[in-house]
A protein has these predicted regions:
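Active-site core of metal-dependent hydrolases
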Residues: 158, 231-338, 353-356, 392-394, ...
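Histidine-rich, glycine-flanked metal-binding segment
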Residues: 32-33, 38, 47, 51-93, ...
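His/Asp/Glu-enriched, well-ordered alpha-helical/loop segment
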Residues: 44, 106-107, 113-122, 254, ...
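Bacterial Sec-dependent N-terminal signal peptides
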Residues: 1-30
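Polyanionic/metal-chelating signatures
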Residues: 140-286, 424, 430, 437-438
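Central antiparallel beta-sheet cores of small beta-barrel/beta-sandwich binding domains
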Residues: 454-533, 539-555, 563
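Acidic, glycine-enriched loop/beta-strand segments at the rims
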Residues: 28-34, 47-59, 72, 378-386, ...
């Protein structure tokens, strides 16, 4: 029922013109026509073949989705379409170790009339190892567009679900006319989240249930072998759960275990040590206290490609702030500094790691990575986490993770060195298909206050949708060092205009960000807006939960000033 309402809400929003397809993401073939050639030569670009390598001028020859050559004196076939790369910097396509881009959660099963919360069925309790992320994935989702624009070309998709959600898979973010599936059943997705209002509802209960499922699968496997080779033996009971768990207990696929902090890391490791399954830890957010344990255990690690919100620590001190408030801000800053320095400490300890983007906004991924670099992570380690380390962890180094002849043509083409402040991604090549993105000249930051122009006032904004153009007004007022405001939009219920308060307004350099809520079809949706301000105009995108990123633009009305 919840999923039905959510779909209805999104449909209402789309029909009202509030959200749109990502038209900012201008792809290389807007007409949808089949390209006349599958052979490309990107000439005289600065190529970084792998982390740690120095950039060198080279040409990359691509044919049928495969890199055919990398060098300065390549002989190019006559059918090759030449792309001048003189001002471009090329990197291996980024790899996401665990992603839910393009994933839609299946509807929750209906509880029977005689439901017993102490003995729920596996499916109702969130134990669904037979489910596949491929069945929940769509390449058409705007989240996929946003991830690709951020440089990601290959991702391990993770199914939505409960404590044992199902089978992950490897997909490329390529042509929507292809299945894009590289490999199904790459890992079993699991976590320590209990079921609501039923067993197992606690972390201890989840661990006990996982142990029970694992052990019963082992027994079923042994009994099946005995039944197949002997007569007079009772037939074993084979359930969908036990059947789907067979690859895990036989060591053919690892368990991708989501853990957020050091305690959850220890619990997942204890299950692994007791039961003997292969393990990849994902979603690590607070892990400094277990870095030595991660190193000694040799566990494969995917950390969150996200950093905590820093708005609170950047707020200016007020003259009337109490010592208690100042002390609280100091503790918040210390906690923030500790969080962003963890990746650098993981590198220093010699623990190879990659990233998961689950829970992060595509538009913020590079910003988060640059923050980690400023806090001590080397650029080489950052690039390795996006490429070679991720390929090693996922077992795809044979065809991905670096720029070499014979590997898949997955590339990121940027306007400058990838971690430089003003560098932007201009092209992304996925499986030989070239996607092109708009780049804009960015102004450098000039202190905490925005340099892109004043933002206080009333903005007329528009958003292009499948139903046409629609919009409203954004009103922003400045009060000291902070901002407040409202936004109007077409009410999804069809009753005229609706208004919502703006939250978390931030304006630094030329970058404006804020969020607000939309009520539609009985659901509350959070919208995050990120835009670049230039004079009296802004252009950017808005992210709506799992539905991805959509374009928004606006013009400041100078006659309607909202300063306090």
């Amino acid at each position: 029922m919840r999923k039905t309402l959510l779909k209805a809400s999104v449909l209402c929003l789309m029909l009202s013109g509030f959200i749109s397809r990502a038209s900012l993401f201008a792809q290389s073939d807007p007409t949808g026509k089949k390209p006349i050639t599958s052979t490309y030569a990107i000439t005289n670009a600065t190529v970084f073949a792998k982390p740690g390598s120095e950039g060198s001028k080279a040409t990359i020859l691509i044919k049928d989705g495969v890199i055919k050559g990398v060098g300065s004196n390549l002989s190019l076939p006559v059918e090759a379409k030449v792309i001048a790369g003189d001002s471009l910097f090329i990197y291996p396509g980024f790899i996401d170790g665990a992603s839910q881009a393009g994933i839609t959660k299946p509807e929750d099963p209906k509880r029977p009339d005689n439901f017993d919360s102490s003995k729920p069925s596996d499916e109702i309790a969130g134990i669904t190892p037979w489910r596949s992320a491929v069945d929940q994935f769509s390449i058409d989702g705007s989240q996929v567009d946003a991830m690709r624009q951020a440089g990601f070309t290959l991702i391990q998709i993770v199914p939505e679900g409960g404590m044992i959600a199902g089978k992950s898979a490897l997909v490329i973010l390529g042509d929507d006319k292809s299945t894009n599936v590289i490999k199904e059943n790459t890992s079993l997705s699991s976590n320590l989240n209990g079921a609501r209002g039923m067993y197992p509802g606690t972390t201890v209960g989840v661990m006990a249930k996982f142990r029970d499922v694992y052990k019963n699968t082992e027994l079923t496997k042994n009994r099946t072998a005995t039944f197949a080779s002997n007569t007079g033996v009772v037939r074993p009971e084979i359930t969908p759960t036990y059947q789907a768990m067979m690859d895990v207990i036989s060591g053919q696929v690892p368990v991708l275990f989501e853990v957020g902090n050091d305690l959850e890391v220890r619990r997942a490791l204890s299950l692994k040590n007791e039961l003997g399954f292969q393990l990849i830890l994902t979603g690590l957010e607070e892990y400094e206290n277990v870095i030595d344990l991660l190193k000694s255990s040799g566990t494969k690690v995917l950390i969150q490609l996200a950093v905590p919100d820093d708005k609170a620590i950047k707020a200016k001190e007020g003259e009337d702030e109490s010592e208690e408030v100042k002390a609280l801000k100091a503790r918040v800053k210390a906690s923030y500094d500790k969080a962003i320095a963890q990746a650098g400490k993981l590198e220093a300890a010699g623990v190879p790691f990659a990233f998961t983007t689950i829970g992060a906004k595509p538009n913020d991924l590079m910003k988060s990575l640059k923050t980690m670099i400023e806090a001590g992570l080397s650029e080489e380690a950052a690039l390795a986490a996006l490429t070679t380390n991720a390929a090693d962890i996922l077992g795809v180094s044979k065809f991905a993770g670096s720029i070499e002849s014979g590997k898949m043509a997955n590339l990121v083409l940027a306007t400058g060195p990838i971690f430089e402040e003003d560098s932007q991604i201009k092209h992304v090549v996925v499986d030989g298909k070239i996607f092109e993105y708009e780049t804009k000249a960015k102004k450098k930051k000039e202190g905490a206050e925005g340099s892109g122009g004043a933002i206080a006032g009333t903005w007329d904004y528009t958003s292009e949708t499948p139903a046409g153009s629609s919009g409203g007004k954004i009103t922003i007022a400045k009060d000291g060092s902070s901002y407040s405001g409202t936004i109007t939009y077409d009410d999804p219920a069809g009753s005229g205009a609706a208004t919502s308060d703006l939250e978390d307004i931030s304006y630094e350099g030329s970058s404006l960000t804020f969020s607000f809520g939309v009520s539609a079809g009985g659901m509350n949706l959070k919208v995050d807006v990120s835009a670049e301000v230039s004079g009296n105009t802004m252009d950017g995108s808005m992210i709506i939960g799992e539905f991805g990123s959509f374009p928004i633009s606006g013009t400041l009305n100078p006659t309607l000033i909202a300063n306090k």
